[in-house]
From Swiss-Prot:
Job of this protein: Functions as a regulator of the biosynthesis of TSH in the anterior pituitary gland and as a neurotransmitter/ neuromodulator in the central and peripheral nervous systems.
Source organism of the structure: Gallus gallus (Chicken)
List of residues that carry Leucine amide: 115
Protein name: Pro-thyrotropin-releasing hormone
Residue positions, PTM Pyrrolidone carboxylic acid: 79, 93, 113, 134, 163, 246
Amino acid sequence: MPSIQLPVLLLCLTLSGVCLNGRQFPPELSENMGRSSLDDILQRSGSHMLQSVLKKVEKKEEMNKELNMPLPQWLSKRQHPGKRYISDPEKRQHPGKRDVEEKASFGDIQKRQHLGKTEVEGYLVNYLELKKRQHPGRRSLWDQSTDISSSQLTYLNELSKRQHPGRRYLMYKHQHPSKRGWNDELDLSDQNWEKHQQFGNRDRDSDSPDYTGPCDLQQSAICNKDSLLLDLAEKFSKEGVEEKHQHPGRRSAWENETEE
């Protein structure tokens, strides 16, 4: 309808202008020629009105076309260039708020998570890393025993063989008590007990059923006299050496006990 009304209005205005321009006024109406200026003003006002009407019609047609267009295309034309891409909302979202199930993989989620919040599958690796970061005194005995690898144990064994017998296990003695294992302490106590024992009595367990003593007097035929003499000689020689190493004040007490 607006497209039909527009040419009709134009024809009417042109015809009225031609009639006014070609019209011949009678001589008695010559005094009214001063009113021609008023007619010019009216024509100009009419032309302005027509222009305004045409502009309004054009705007209405544009609005109708935009309404008939699809919604995303219409919005993309009206939006700012930096705010377009409404068809792809993930580009406008924050990286941390995107759909995790479609765009982010499980590995990326583990990388972004905190160490204490990772899944159970990677718990062992994280536990080992945390154990390394802890203070040695706060670790458990099991963790301390697992820290010593097989290569370190072989190195300690070779080192103990190459060292002087009196200087073995020096590394264990200088360690902190919390870092020593209970097996090491038992080995050290056994070694110290062997040092304090008499030379002839070492490596003999009197409680064992196989132990029969140096010689059984009731079984004189089975007893080896040579071995008995050697044991007695070693015993007396060892006692003499220990007597020399003892303090003079301690010898008298031992001699009194022997005399009694």
